[in-house]
């Protein structure tokens, strides 16, 4: 299956379009770029200048309030009759169910004419300002539910995306499973 899919990729013009606030999503985009045959990459960069005439789009986002960031949401709505692979990062991690909910929301931005080739998400580190805000919340006179769990999650996220996060993105997009959007 992977050989067939790789053959298809070699005969396509691919665009890797992403937005990365903290560098996490760019790490995933770089990994995808390294796996794709160089001669097939028509575009690599932000959605502002991305062409709309590639055959296959690898679209990366950072998570904003349980959804993709706005500029990627807008870009996804412009893509028609294309093959799409979604990838993203979220500061809150360790929960596949949470990632699946985000991906389902992001998929809703895609026109039904597109074919979703696959998707992948992993945890990403957050800016230190987030931890500082959590500590202020913890030390405030008003109790904040789950603040200790939020701080623990922040501390776990510091090393992500790591090698274990990057490895699957290299192979996940090569899957031959295609899901038509309904």
Which role fits each region the language model picked out?
Residues 13-31:
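N-terminal beta1-alpha1 ligand-phosphate binding loop
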Residues 29, 162-174:
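Short, amphipathic alpha-helical "lid/cap" segments that border enzyme active or binding sites
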Residues 31-39:
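A short, Lys/Arg-enriched amphipathic alpha-helix followed by its capping loop at the start of a domain
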Residues 45-133:
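Helix-loop-strand module that forms the ligand-binding subsite of alpha/beta enzymes
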Residues 133-145:
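Oxidoreductase cofactor-interface core, primarily capturing Rossmann-like NAD(P)-dependent enzymes
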Residues 148-160:
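Short glycine/proline- and acidic residue-enriched helix-loop micro-motifs
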Residues 173, 178-182:
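Single conserved hydrophobic/aromatic residue that forms the stacking wall/gate
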